[in-house]
Regions:
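Compact alpha-helical subdomains of small soluble proteins
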Residues: 252, 259-305
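Acidic/histidine-rich, surface-exposed loop or edge segments in extracytoplasmic proteins
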Residues: 214-226, 268-272
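Amphipathic alpha-helical packing elements
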Residues: 228-270
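C-terminal motif of bacterial Sec signal peptides marking the signal peptidase cleavage site
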Residues: 15-18
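Surface-exposed intrinsically disordered loops and tails
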Residues: 66, 77, 185, 189-211, ...
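Bacterial N-terminal signal peptides that target proteins for export
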Residues: 1-7
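Beta-sheet ligand-binding and adhesion/scaffold domains
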Residues: 25-27, 35-80, 90-98, 104-192
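Sec/Tat-exported extracytoplasmic proteins
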Residues: 57, 241-244, 248, 293-296
Length: 305
């Protein structure tokens, strides 16, 4: 009798365990089904609007000249809006200004062909774009979320669609301005009055300038040697190096480099990190250029503007 009771209890335990397994398996299947539904991407629409739109980003700011009082004037910057994905309910992409890349999410109105695009909001420079599409151009405005945190809380923009394509042959054109206007340096100069013979010392502001070597040396195409670089100016080396990154669409934070490459019609900033896109020869050349930049010197001169 005892054996019979023991067998009955054992069978009951097995039955309960089996039910629990079935329940767990059913729940797991339901969860997996739910996960699959959540991960199914919404269908994309209007892929013809995908791409980079570049152009002027203008707003009024207080400008402080070297001489005279501050005044309010128009300040123009270069803006890139990159539209990556459009669905029925959402638009995804990123904005790039002054090398600062911010994601955005918004909506597209098919009836008016207009976008409302919001940056995340946790950076002081974040805001909302309200733009209208007209063929291959975007026009509209931007408003900062925190109007007291930025110099120009309201801006207008006029952008044209640009195709980004990496090309190792891209170079600065030979009519490019090679002066670094962003980093002037003061030098002590002497002046002798011809009438009195008295010599006086004064401070003169000078800017560094690159040489024509930047039009000839291409670190994306040729394997550089120490002989190629040993007599170059520091600014030469910096331009040759950063031309590599510009060809890959790097968004420069330093105004100096933006000034040089925005003179071209091929520079399209699309990312704030292109390290993984560099070719083996580019990586080797950048490493060599960095070594020479560390010890190179610049040539300064006086220039009117």
């Amino acid at each position: 009798m005892k054996n019979l009771k023991f067998i009955s209890a054992f069978l009951l335990v097995l039955a309960l365990a089996s039910c629990k397994k079935e329940s767990t398996a059913t729940a797991s299947m339901q969860n997996n089904s739910s996960d699959k539904k959540d991960t199914v991407a919404a269908p994309e629409i209007h892929k013809e609007y995908y791409g980079v739109y570049m152009g002027d980003f203008a707003g009024k700011e207080m400008i402080t000249p070297e001489i005279g009082e501050a005044y309010e004037g128009d300040v123009y910057k270069r803006l890139s809006l990159k539209i990556n994905r459009i669905t029925k309910d959402s638009v995804y992409g990123q904005s790039i200004v002054n090398g600062n890349q911010r994601p955005f999410r918004g909506i597209f109105n098919e009836a008016t062909k207009s976008f409302i695009l919001d940056e995340p909001g946790h950076d002081k420079s974040d805001g909302r774009f309200e733009v209208k599409l007209n063929n291959d151009s975007l026009t509209g405005k931007w408003s900062a979320f925190n109007t007291s945190a930025v110099k120009s809380p309201h801006k207008v923009l006029k952008l044209a669609k640009k195709e980004f394509a990496y090309n190792p042959n891209f170079m600065l054109s030979e009519n490019s301005d090679l002066i670094d206007w962003e980093n002037p340096k003061d030098f002590a100069e002497k002046y002798t009055d011809e009438e009195t013979g008295k010599t006086e010392t004064y401070m003169a502001s000078k800017n560094r300038i690159a040489s024509g070597a930047v039009f000839k040396i291409n670190a994306s195409r040729q394997k550089l040697t120490e002989k190629d670089l040993k007599n170059l100016r520091k600014l030469d080396l910096e331009i040759i190096k950063n031309a590599v990154f510009a060809r890959h669409g790097y968004a420069f934070k330093k105004q100096t480099y933006r000034n040089f490459f925005e003179q071209t019609d091929w520079y399209v900033p699309v990312s704030n990190n292109v390290d993984n896109d560099l070719t083996p020869i580019e990586k080797e050349n950048v490493a060599l250029l960095n070594r020479f930049i560390k010890y190179a010197e610049d040539k300064y001169d006086s220039f009117g503007r």
